[in-house]
Amino acid sequence: MNMHLILLSLLCCASSAYADIWGDLSQAAQVAYTAPLNGEYVRQTRTGIDSFEIYRLRDKNTLTERRVAKSKAYEILRERDKISFYAANAQDLKAADTDESNRFPAVLPFFVQYLSESYEASYQGDGRIAGRTCHIVRLTPNDDNRYTQELCLDDTDNLPLSRIYLHNDIIVRADLFAALDRETLPVAAELTPTRGLNYTIERTLNEDFARLGENDTFIQSLPTGFRVAGYEQGTLGGYYLITDGLANITLFVEPVDNAHHQLPNIAKNGVFSTAARQSKKHHFTAIGDLPQDGLKRWLDSVEFAD
């Protein structure tokens, strides 16, 4: 598998890849892993800003979550390892099943930083993107100017930059944090799809993926609390998906003599950090939602059978 495609598919958090992606909660929110969640999340896409209402309830054995697309005519219901898409007609149902935004976890980002502390921002003038007039703001991470991205913000979304949070193309306005309610349990009606959405598709999350790495002996030891959630071998090397339930890290392993080593040239997304390490036989690259220095310490502490 082409390494670019591996990276893209992982960063998009495809719902079929592993079963507990929607179970992750925001480290920044400092809430318990079992906390309920009501509210809204907003993410920037190539065609504008998507917004979803979220109703989420989790206990020790069950996860129920309903997502209502505010600008699109469909809803999504997650119950344990089942994901169901609901729409009023076949066209909207197809859009719901293929929409890239549905591949993102319906929660707040895992690690959030103020833009004013992690980015240099510059106003690029007004523009028109996907039929929408907006203010173009260019954001450049202070630690690496190769990973610049531009945001399309209209008058409603154009808050002072210090009040906008960003992670993996997800924008969460500061005022939305106040609107998110993590204490009140969602009522039954909020966890039930709207009547009249009679077109449905049901998907089963692939839990086998999460078991692939359990018997792998290449990783000898991980930092406390982390586990291998999945592994896949590609044409240029392999990658591990590693998580502690809050942070998600992708660890790429490539042979040192691989003439097609490309990872340093792949642009990271949002405020994902990267760290690298090399042994005599392998080159290791970690991409994750930890602070840059924290990810480097994390990678240095992993023990390999190399």
PLM-predicted stretches and their roles:
Residues 130-195:
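Gly/Pro-enriched, hydrophobic low-complexity segments
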Residues 49-53, 71-73, 145-149, 172-173, ...:
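Short, surface-exposed coil-to-beta transition loops
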Residues 99-148:
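Intrinsically disordered, low-complexity linker/loop segments enriched in Gly/Pro
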Residues 197-280, 293-294:
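Short, solvent-exposed recognition patches
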Residues 52-106, 162-184:
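An acidic-aromatic
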Residues 34-40, 60-65, 131-138, 159-162, ...:
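Short, hydrophobic/aromatic-rich segments at coil-to-beta transitions
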Residues 2-9:
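Sec-dependent signal peptide recognition
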Residues 9-11, 16-61, 114-116, 126, ...:
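N-terminal leader/targeting segments and the immediate start of mature chains
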